[in-house]
Protein backbone atom coordinates (compact mmCIF):
# COMPACT_ATOMS: atom_id res chain seq x y z
CA UNK A 1 0.00 0.00 0.00
CA UNK A 2 1.37 3.41 -0.97
CA UNK A 3 1.61 6.42 1.33
CA UNK A 4 -1.37 7.97 -0.44
CA UNK A 5 -3.37 4.77 -0.04
CA UNK A 6 -2.45 4.61 3.65
CA UNK A 7 -3.66 8.16 4.10
CA UNK A 8 -6.92 7.41 2.29
CA UNK A 9 -7.51 4.29 4.38
CA UNK A 10 -6.89 6.22 7.59
CA UNK A 11 -9.30 8.95 6.55
CA UNK A 12 -11.95 6.33 5.74
CA UNK A 13 -11.86 5.02 9.32
CA UNK A 14 -13.66 7.92 10.95
CA UNK A 15 -12.92 8.35 14.63
CA UNK A 16 -14.34 11.85 14.77
CA UNK A 17 -16.19 13.80 15.98
CA UNK A 18 -15.05 13.14 19.53
CA UNK A 19 -17.71 11.90 21.98
CA UNK A 20 -16.88 15.08 23.91
CA UNK A 21 -17.89 17.28 20.96
CA UNK A 22 -16.69 18.34 17.54
CA UNK A 23 -14.61 21.19 19.00
CA UNK A 24 -13.16 19.24 21.92
CA UNK A 25 -9.41 19.50 22.53
CA UNK A 26 -9.13 17.79 25.92
CA UNK A 27 -10.02 14.18 25.14
CA UNK A 28 -10.17 11.92 28.17
CA UNK A 29 -9.02 14.75 30.44
CA UNK A 30 -12.67 15.83 30.38
CA UNK A 31 -13.18 13.11 33.00
CA UNK A 32 -10.82 14.77 35.49
CA UNK A 33 -13.17 16.92 37.54
CA UNK A 34 -13.31 18.17 41.13
CA UNK A 35 -14.58 14.81 42.34
CA UNK A 36 -11.72 12.97 40.67
CA UNK A 37 -9.18 15.33 42.22
CA UNK A 38 -10.66 14.79 45.69
CA UNK A 39 -10.57 11.05 45.08
CA UNK A 40 -6.88 11.32 44.25
CA UNK A 41 -6.04 13.40 47.32
CA UNK A 42 -7.76 10.85 49.56
CA UNK A 43 -4.92 8.44 48.67
CA UNK A 44 -2.33 10.68 50.36
CA UNK A 45 -1.80 9.29 53.87
CA UNK A 46 1.95 9.44 54.56
CA UNK A 47 3.01 12.56 52.67
CA UNK A 48 5.64 10.57 50.74
CA UNK A 49 6.57 12.11 47.38
CA UNK A 50 8.11 10.42 44.34
CA UNK A 51 9.59 12.53 41.55
CA UNK A 52 8.91 10.78 38.25
CA UNK A 53 10.86 13.22 36.05
CA UNK A 54 14.33 12.96 34.53
CA UNK A 55 17.03 15.64 34.73
CA UNK A 56 17.38 17.56 31.47
CA UNK A 57 20.85 18.25 30.08
CA UNK A 58 22.85 17.87 26.88
CA UNK A 59 23.34 14.15 27.57
CA UNK A 60 19.62 13.30 27.47
CA UNK A 61 18.98 10.38 25.06
CA UNK A 62 17.71 11.76 21.75
CA UNK A 63 17.33 10.67 18.16
CA UNK A 64 18.95 12.61 15.29
CA UNK A 65 17.34 16.00 14.76
CA UNK A 66 16.48 16.47 18.43
CA UNK A 67 18.76 18.12 20.95
CA UNK A 68 19.01 20.05 24.19
CA UNK A 69 21.44 22.98 24.46
CA UNK A 70 21.79 25.35 27.40
CA UNK A 71 24.06 28.38 27.37
CA UNK A 72 24.77 30.51 30.42
CA UNK A 73 24.23 34.24 29.91
CA UNK A 74 25.90 36.56 32.43
CA UNK A 75 24.71 39.79 30.84
CA UNK A 76 24.25 41.62 34.11
CA UNK A 77 27.83 40.98 35.23
CA UNK A 78 29.19 42.12 31.88
CA UNK A 79 27.11 45.28 32.03
CA UNK A 80 27.88 45.93 35.70
CA UNK A 81 31.60 45.20 36.12
CA UNK A 82 31.90 47.39 39.21
CA UNK A 83 30.05 44.99 41.46
CA UNK A 84 26.40 45.15 40.55
CA UNK A 85 23.43 47.50 40.59
CA UNK A 86 22.62 49.73 43.53
CA UNK A 87 24.19 50.05 46.94
CA UNK A 88 23.41 46.38 47.57
CA UNK A 89 25.37 45.28 44.47
CA UNK A 90 22.65 43.06 43.04
CA UNK A 91 23.63 41.01 40.00
CA UNK A 92 22.16 37.99 38.25
CA UNK A 93 22.85 35.06 35.97
CA UNK A 94 20.46 33.67 33.36
CA UNK A 95 20.54 31.05 30.66
CA UNK A 96 19.19 30.39 27.18
CA UNK A 97 17.82 27.00 26.17
CA UNK A 98 17.42 25.68 22.63
CA UNK A 99 15.68 22.33 22.37
CA UNK A 100 12.63 20.38 21.31
CA UNK A 101 10.05 19.56 23.94
CA UNK A 102 9.86 16.04 22.51
CA UNK A 103 12.70 14.79 24.70
CA UNK A 104 13.26 14.02 28.36
CA UNK A 105 10.22 13.49 30.56
CA UNK A 106 7.47 15.19 28.62
CA UNK A 107 3.74 15.26 28.04
CA UNK A 108 2.55 14.80 24.46
CA UNK A 109 -0.22 17.15 23.42
CA UNK A 110 -2.96 15.66 21.25
CA UNK A 111 -1.43 17.47 18.27
CA UNK A 112 1.70 15.30 18.32
CA UNK A 113 0.50 12.26 16.35
CA UNK A 114 -1.74 11.74 13.35
CA UNK A 115 -3.21 8.86 11.38
CA UNK A 116 -2.61 9.73 7.77
CA UNK A 117 -3.07 13.49 7.74
CA UNK A 118 -5.72 13.59 10.47
CA UNK A 119 -5.28 13.92 14.20
CA UNK A 120 -7.52 13.90 17.25
CA UNK A 121 -11.11 14.90 16.48
CA UNK A 122 -10.40 14.63 12.76
CA UNK A 123 -8.42 17.83 12.36
CA UNK A 124 -6.02 17.70 9.43
CA UNK A 125 -2.38 18.70 9.50
CA UNK A 126 -3.39 21.74 7.43
CA UNK A 127 -5.90 22.66 10.15
CA UNK A 128 -3.30 22.22 12.88
CA UNK A 129 0.08 23.33 11.64
CA UNK A 130 1.11 26.99 11.65
CA UNK A 131 4.49 28.62 11.21
CA UNK A 132 5.24 29.10 14.89
CA UNK A 133 3.26 26.15 16.24
CA UNK A 134 -0.04 24.35 16.05
CA UNK A 135 -3.26 26.34 15.84
CA UNK A 136 -5.29 23.78 17.77
CA UNK A 137 -4.48 21.04 20.28
CA UNK A 138 -1.44 22.93 21.55
CA UNK A 139 -0.14 22.06 24.98
CA UNK A 140 -1.14 25.51 26.29
CA UNK A 141 -4.73 24.28 26.35
CA UNK A 142 -3.96 21.17 28.41
CA UNK A 143 -4.96 21.76 32.04
CA UNK A 144 -2.66 20.97 34.93
CA UNK A 145 -3.45 17.46 36.06
CA UNK A 146 -4.27 16.03 39.48
CA UNK A 147 -5.81 12.58 39.37
CA UNK A 148 -5.66 9.07 40.74
CA UNK A 149 -2.71 7.09 39.43
CA UNK A 150 -2.02 3.38 39.11
CA UNK A 151 1.41 1.78 38.62
CA UNK A 152 1.72 -1.47 36.70
CA UNK A 153 5.06 -3.04 37.70
CA UNK A 154 5.43 -5.59 34.92
CA UNK A 155 8.84 -7.05 35.90
CA UNK A 156 7.54 -7.74 39.41
CA UNK A 157 4.50 -9.51 37.97
CA UNK A 158 6.67 -11.63 35.67
CA UNK A 159 9.53 -12.26 38.09
CA UNK A 160 12.22 -10.64 35.92
CA UNK A 161 14.58 -7.68 36.36
CA UNK A 162 13.32 -5.82 33.31
CA UNK A 163 11.59 -6.31 30.01
CA UNK A 164 13.52 -6.33 26.74
CA UNK A 165 13.03 -4.60 23.36
CA UNK A 166 9.85 -5.73 21.66
CA UNK A 167 8.41 -7.31 24.82
CA UNK A 168 4.68 -6.66 24.84
CA UNK A 169 2.78 -5.74 27.98
CA UNK A 170 -0.59 -7.46 27.70
CA UNK A 171 -3.97 -7.09 29.33
CA UNK A 172 -3.10 -10.05 31.55
CA UNK A 173 -0.40 -7.88 33.16
CA UNK A 174 -3.12 -5.50 34.34
CA UNK A 175 -4.78 -7.92 36.76
CA UNK A 176 -5.92 -6.01 39.84
CA UNK A 177 -5.72 -2.61 38.14
CA UNK A 178 -9.21 -1.11 38.10
CA UNK A 179 -9.14 2.43 36.70
CA UNK A 180 -12.23 4.54 36.42
CA UNK A 181 -12.70 7.40 33.92
CA UNK A 182 -10.12 10.14 34.42
CA UNK A 183 -7.50 7.96 36.12
CA UNK A 184 -3.86 7.67 35.04
CA UNK A 185 -2.18 4.31 34.47
CA UNK A 186 1.63 4.27 34.40
CA UNK A 187 3.83 1.34 33.42
CA UNK A 188 7.16 0.27 34.91
CA UNK A 189 9.16 -2.02 32.61
CA UNK A 190 12.63 -1.58 34.09
CA UNK A 191 13.87 -0.18 30.77
CA UNK A 192 14.54 3.18 32.42
CA UNK A 193 17.61 1.66 34.10
CA UNK A 194 19.38 2.20 30.76
CA UNK A 195 18.71 5.95 30.77
CA UNK A 196 22.37 6.90 31.27
CA UNK A 197 23.42 4.70 28.32
CA UNK A 198 21.82 6.72 25.54
CA UNK A 199 22.68 4.29 22.76
CA UNK A 200 21.35 1.33 24.71
CA UNK A 201 18.27 3.18 25.92
CA UNK A 202 17.26 4.14 22.38
CA UNK A 203 17.91 0.64 20.98
CA UNK A 204 14.29 -0.45 21.01
CA UNK A 205 11.99 -0.68 24.01
CA UNK A 206 9.32 -2.82 25.65
CA UNK A 207 5.84 -1.47 26.21
CA UNK A 208 2.09 -1.92 26.28
CA UNK A 209 0.59 -3.50 23.18
CA UNK A 210 -2.42 -2.50 21.12
CA UNK A 211 -4.77 -4.58 23.25
CA UNK A 212 -3.74 -2.56 26.30
CA UNK A 213 -4.27 0.69 24.39
CA UNK A 214 -7.86 -0.31 23.67
CA UNK A 215 -8.30 -1.51 27.28
CA UNK A 216 -7.20 1.89 28.61
CA UNK A 217 -9.42 3.80 26.19
CA UNK A 218 -12.47 1.65 26.98
CA UNK A 219 -12.09 2.57 30.66
CA UNK A 220 -11.76 6.29 30.03
CA UNK A 221 -8.18 6.51 31.25
CA UNK A 222 -7.07 10.11 30.82
CA UNK A 223 -3.30 9.71 30.96
CA UNK A 224 -0.77 6.94 30.58
CA UNK A 225 3.00 6.73 30.40
CA UNK A 226 6.00 4.47 30.68
CA UNK A 227 9.70 4.42 31.63
CA UNK A 228 10.60 4.33 27.93
CA UNK A 229 11.30 6.87 25.19
CA UNK A 230 7.97 6.28 23.45
CA UNK A 231 4.94 4.20 24.39
CA UNK A 232 4.56 0.68 23.06
CA UNK A 233 7.00 -2.05 22.02
CA UNK A 234 9.83 -1.41 19.56
CA UNK A 235 10.08 -3.49 17.41
CA UNK A 236 6.28 -3.27 17.20
CA UNK A 237 3.82 -6.15 17.30
CA UNK A 238 3.27 -5.72 13.56
CA UNK A 239 6.46 -4.57 11.76
CA UNK A 240 4.30 -2.80 9.18
CA UNK A 241 2.55 -0.67 11.83
CA UNK A 242 5.11 1.33 13.84
CA UNK A 243 4.07 3.39 16.88
CA UNK A 244 0.49 2.20 16.58
CA UNK A 245 -0.06 2.08 20.35
CA UNK A 246 0.36 5.82 21.03
CA UNK A 247 -1.46 6.51 17.77
CA UNK A 248 -4.52 4.60 19.02
CA UNK A 249 -4.43 6.47 22.31
CA UNK A 250 -3.51 9.97 21.17
CA UNK A 251 -5.31 10.25 17.84
CA UNK A 252 -8.38 8.08 18.14
CA UNK A 253 -9.28 8.37 21.80
CA UNK A 254 -7.70 11.52 23.22
CA UNK A 255 -5.67 9.68 25.86
CA UNK A 256 -2.60 11.71 26.83
CA UNK A 257 0.84 10.07 26.95
CA UNK A 258 3.90 10.88 29.08
CA UNK A 259 7.30 9.55 27.99
CA UNK A 260 10.63 8.93 29.71
CA UNK A 261 9.20 8.55 33.20
CA UNK A 262 11.41 7.52 36.12
CA UNK A 263 9.27 4.93 37.85
CA UNK A 264 12.07 2.99 39.59
CA UNK A 265 11.57 4.26 43.16
CA UNK A 266 7.80 3.97 42.93
CA UNK A 267 8.12 0.35 41.81
CA UNK A 268 10.83 -0.48 44.37
CA UNK A 269 8.57 0.65 47.21
CA UNK A 270 5.66 -1.40 45.95
CA UNK A 271 3.39 1.60 45.39
CA UNK A 272 0.43 0.70 43.22
CA UNK A 273 -2.06 3.54 43.77
CA UNK A 274 -1.27 7.20 44.36
CA UNK A 275 -2.21 10.78 43.70
CA UNK A 276 -0.55 11.95 40.50
CA UNK A 277 0.25 15.64 40.05
CA UNK A 278 1.48 16.63 36.60
CA UNK A 279 2.11 20.27 35.79
CA UNK A 280 3.69 21.74 32.68
CA UNK A 281 4.56 25.03 31.04
CA UNK A 282 1.75 26.46 28.90
CA UNK A 283 3.69 26.76 25.67
CA UNK A 284 1.46 28.18 22.97
CA UNK A 285 1.35 25.99 19.88
CA UNK A 286 3.74 23.34 21.21
CA UNK A 287 3.17 19.62 20.60
CA UNK A 288 4.46 18.74 24.05
CA UNK A 289 5.97 20.12 27.24
CA UNK A 290 8.60 19.03 29.71
CA UNK A 291 7.22 17.89 33.01
CA UNK A 292 8.38 16.37 36.26
CA UNK A 293 5.30 14.61 37.61
CA UNK A 294 5.08 13.64 41.24
CA UNK A 295 3.31 10.71 42.87
CA UNK A 296 2.03 11.26 46.41
CA UNK A 297 1.04 8.56 48.90
Report the location of each language-model feature.
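Active-/binding-site microenvironments in catalytic and ligand-binding cores
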Residues: 1-297
Amino acid sequence: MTTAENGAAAAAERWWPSPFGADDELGMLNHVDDGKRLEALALVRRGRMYDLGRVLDEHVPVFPGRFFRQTLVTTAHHANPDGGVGDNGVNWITEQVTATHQLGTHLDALSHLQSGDRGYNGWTVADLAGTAGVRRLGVEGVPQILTRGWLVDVPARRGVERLEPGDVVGVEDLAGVEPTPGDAVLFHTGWGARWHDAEGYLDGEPGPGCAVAHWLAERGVALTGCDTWSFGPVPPEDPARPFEVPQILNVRHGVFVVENLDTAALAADGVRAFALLLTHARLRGATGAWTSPIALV
